[in-house]
From Swiss-Prot:
Component of the transcription factor SL1/TIF-IB complex, composed of TBP and at least TAF1A, TAF1B, TAF1C and TAF1D. In the complex interacts directly with TBP, TAF1A and TAF1C. Interaction of the SL1/TIF-IB subunits with TBP excludes interaction of TBP with the transcription factor IID (TFIID) subunits. Interacts with TBP and RRN3. Interacts with FLNA (via N-terminus). Part of Pol I pre-initiation complex (PIC), in which Pol I core assembles with RRN3 and promoter-bound UTBF and SL1/TIF-IB complex. This is TATA box-binding protein-associated factor RNA polymerase I subunit B. It comes from Mus musculus (Mouse). Component of RNA polymerase I core factor complex that acts as a GTF2B/TFIIB-like factor and plays a key role in multiple steps during transcription initiation such as pre-initiation complex (PIC) assembly and postpolymerase recruitment events in polymerase I (Pol I) transcription. Binds rDNA promoters and plays a role in Pol I recruitment as a component of the SL1/TIF-IB complex and, possibly, directly through its interaction with RRN3. The modification N6-acetyllysine is found at K438. It comes from the Eukaryota. The gene is Taf1b. GO terms for biological process: RNA polymerase I preinitiation complex assembly; transcription by RNA polymerase I. The keyword Transcription regulation applies. The lineage of its organism: Eukaryota, Metazoa, Chordata, Craniata, Vertebrata.
């Protein structure tokens, strides 16, 4: 039956009053505007009997097949919705509470769809370029209170129950937007791929694949889960959380090509600073209220994280007492400082993992100075003591720790670099510019796979890289006398002295990582030039920054900011002296 014959049915739709009808596989009329199915039916004549006949029908519930790719008509937001769903499922597999997927991330995503005017509003922005008007009863940030409240599904329904249940491949916890009666664009597999790429509005934060990680990170922070941003990035690297080529998780009916490639194809690893900035941007864009308090019993509190990282970098447990003192003196353990509040004037989240590592660096400087001299002198004393007192608890030997860590770190970094070099960026589901290039793209992909097989046969079977099991720790330290000796139980006795009722460090000197902070518009408070610092300091920063998957300069900056809080008096005196010198020049 031709489309012209369907137009003979002139009744208005009971839902939207439109006169635009199609036929389902069962021969019933359905509205192409709102997908409402009527009780009226029409006998469908077999297309095999009438040549060159087109039947306007739908399959798999109410989803329409595209005439170009024989797939679904889908929107870009549905693609990101699918990625978020699988990321949330992966986090749940890693031990995160199911509430994160079913409640927190679900509500964040609904709120994003509303704020970006893609759903949960009267006229969502679609390919026609229509502007959406947010419902008048939409919840403002001031009305949220302590809990996150969003528009209910009944306020502005997006899909019928029949459509939602018709497709088991679509993630259930997220709302499914309706397909358009129009077929997919010849320039993209999605209906709105071209328009989405060109959409530019003031204040709009467009969803990207990196921002899906930022949204997951915000959800983890809201739930106060035991996964930091650095852990999230590491799990992405280890392929426990989908990110690179995440579009391969789309159902086969969701064709990805053309402009979709620039939206969903990622050819670089996620960056800590980018995720951090995206978290702040999304929180502000969504008008999120103050997050739940980060108290001392939370995993993200610096005291807890410092203990975790002391175990990670194989340092003595006794150092935890010193890290707690630094946290108390600097005030970074206060609830108001740790709790993220997007509504506050200083819209910034605390880099909890980086901050904890910075505390450990400061404690190491307090103990050993790290000037390439004092730490080795203390090591000689510790080595001599351990030789004479073999039965006693050994004193911490910085030199021995350095040698063990360097060997382990070099091996770990070598394997990490090899894994990155071997990573297959191309997927078996190739991307192509248009549906016309599909056959060429698949032929090229097949050719590449054949060449890889032939090359592997020539050089011999390549070792199969096993997927690492997820773990909170990257290093495994064993008992003394093995390749990776454990320093956790070693004593700081030779590094501390009794003064009155308390123990203080034997070393009374300290050098500041940054003498003067930058006040320019570059937004960097300090710079890091390796040649200006001792080799010991460089070594520690390199190891710690590698564990967090951040740049060395980022950790150095956090150390400098922490020192500014710890030695505020010293910084003020330095500032006054520089000001007086300027006065004498004039």
């Amino acid at each position: 039956m031709d489309v012209e014959e369907v137009k003979a049915f002139r009744d208005r739709c009971s839902q939207c009053a439109a006169v635009s009808w199609g036929l389902t596989d069962e021969g019933k009329y359905y509205c192409t505007s709102c997908h409402n199915v009527t009780d009226r039916s029409e006998e469908v004549v077999s297309a095999a009997d009438i040549p060159n006949t087109k039947i306007n029908s739908i399959n798999r519930g109410l989803r329409q097949r595209s005439k170009h790719e024989k797939g679904w008509d889908w929107y870009v937001c549905e693609g990101f919705q699918c990625i978020l769903y699988h990321q949330a499922k992966a986090l749940e597999t890693l031990g995160v509470s199911p509430e994160l997927k079913n409640e927190v991330l679900h509500n964040f995503w609904k709120r994003y769809l509303q704020k970006s005017k893609q759903a949960y509003c009267k006229n969502p922005v679609r390919t026609s370029g229509r502007k959406a008007k947010v419902l008048e009863d939409s919840v403002q940030s001031s009305d949220l209170g302590s809990d996150l409240e969003l528009l209910s599904d009944t306020t502005c329904p997006l899909e019928s129950e029949a459509e939602f249940q018709s497709d088991p491949q679509i993630p259930k916890p997220f709302p499914v937007t309706k397909g358009s009666p129009k077929s997919a664009s010849v320039c993209s597999g999605s209906v709105d791929g071209v328009e989405y790429s060109e959409r530019k509005e003031k204040g709009l934060v467009k969803m990207t694949v990196p921002r899906t990680l930022a949204l997951c990170s915000l959800s983890l922070l809201w739930q106060r889960e035991t996964i930091t941003v650095s852990d999230l990035l590491r799990f992405v690297e280890e392929d426990h959380i989908p990110y690179i080529n995440a579009f391969k998780l789309f159902p086969e009916e969701m064709k990805v090509y053309g402009r979709d490639k620039g939206i969903f194809a990622i050819e670089s690893w996620p960056d800590y600073e980018d995720i951090y900035k995206n978290m702040i941007e999304l929180a502000i864009f969504l008008d999120l209220p103050r997050f739940p308090d980060i108290t001392e019993d939370c995993y993200l509190h610096p005291n807890t994280l410092c203990m975790k990282y002391l175990l990670e970098v194989n340092l003595p447990d006794e150092m935890h007492t010193l890290t707690c003192q630094v946290v108390k003196l600097t005030g970074i353990g206060e609830v108001d400082f740790l709790t993220f509040d997007p509504i506050a004037k200083t819209k910034r989240t605390v880099k909890y993992d980086v901050q904890a590592m910075a505390v450990i660096v400061v404690v190491l400087k307090l103990l050993f100075l790290l000037d390439d001299k004092l730490e080795w002198s203390y090591s000689d004393l510790a080595e001599a003591y351990n030789e004479q007192h073999r039965e006693d608890t050994p004193q911490f030997d910085f030199r021995k720790w350095y040698q063990v860590m360097k060997k382990t770190f070099d091996e770990k970094r070598r394997k990490w670099e090899e894994a990155r070099a071997r990573y297959a960026w191309k997927t078996k589901r190739p991307l192509y510019r248009s549906h016309i290039d599909k056959s060429v793209a698949y032929k090229r992909r097949k050719m590449v796979e054949n060449l890889q097989k032939q090359f592997s046969a020539l050089v011999g079977s390549s070792p199969v890289v096993e997927k690492q099991a997820p773990s909170s720790f990257q290093f495994n330290w064993t008992e003394e006398g093995t390749d990776s000796p454990c320093f956790h139980g070693h004593s700081l006795q030779g590094l501390l002295i009794m003064k009155g009722q308390s123990m203080i460090t034997k070393n009374s000197l300290y050098w500041l990582s940054t003498q003067k902070f930058c006040k320019s518009y570059c937004k960097h408070v300090t710079t890091y030039e390796e040649s200006n610092f001792s080799l010991s300091y460089q070594f520690i920063l390199n190891i710690f920054s590698f564990l967090l998957r951040i740049k060395t300069s980022a950790l150095h900056e956090e150390v400098s900011l922490l020192e500014k809080k710890l030695f505020e008096k010293k910084y003020n005196e330095s500032k006054k002296s520089s000001g007086s010198k300027k006065g004498r020049r004039h």
